[in-house]
Amino acid sequence: MANRVDHEYDYLFKIVLIGDSGVGKSNILSRFTRNEFCLESKSTIGVEFATRTLQVEGKTVKAQIWDTAGQERYRAITSAYYRGAVGALLVYDITKRQTFDNVQRWLRELRDHADSNIVIMMAGNKSDLKHLRAVSEEDGQALAEKEGLSFLETSALEAVNIEKAFQTILTEIYHIISKKALAAQEASSNLPGQGTTINVADASANQRRSCCST
């Protein structure tokens, strides 16, 4: 099968999807990257990822979304994939209280393994199943505020707030990267006789200016 060559992009941002098994992470991934939803989707084994290129404030950003398995037996495998992530979408199922109760455990794991500046959004998924709701939107919002996270309720089935969730994460990441670049430029300009360009992009958010094959 021939490789598809992506269009040129300015930034590559790695984002991880985390949360319990069965909360809808894989369908969030497929809805965002392929605009697809599979009613018969099975639990992810190990890790898979997909990409999508989009515009963020005039820059072309390639989002590399990693879908990490929620099952306990795979947590040791997936922890390695937090490395290099600059964003995370922490997902729970609004119809299953236990998945919401486990959010703080996932947050601890994320903060133990990921960069301290990682951008995190919490998503209460399956908002289309309001008649089965076990977690109120107010409870979700309150926990997000307590932990300093952005928050949305989403539906991969009905494509509600999926786009907004990722756009919010990517825009916030871009703002952080831009501020770092500006600060580095200002620091460099204050050094007389220094003509060296400072590269502030790290391995997880490299500024790219060439085509690449996937």
Swiss-Prot record:
* CDD domains referenced in this protein's UniProt entry, alphabetically: Rab11_like (cd01868)
Q: InterPro entries attached here?
A: P-loop_NTPase, Rab_GTPases_membrane_traffic, Small_GTP-bd, Small_GTPase
Q: How does it sit in the membrane?
A: Lipid-anchor
- Among its keywords, does the record have GTP-binding? yes
Q: What one GO molecular function would you report for this record?
A: GTP binding
Q: Does the keyword Transit peptide apply?
A: no
Task: Say where the lipid (S-geranylgeranyl cysteine) is covalently attached.
Answer: 211-212
Which terms in the GO cellular component ontology are assigned? plasma membrane
Q: Which family does it belong to?
A: Belongs to the small GTPase superfamily. Rab family.
This protein is called Ras-related protein Rab2BV
Q: What is the species listed in this Swiss-Prot or TrEMBL entry? A: Beta vulgaris
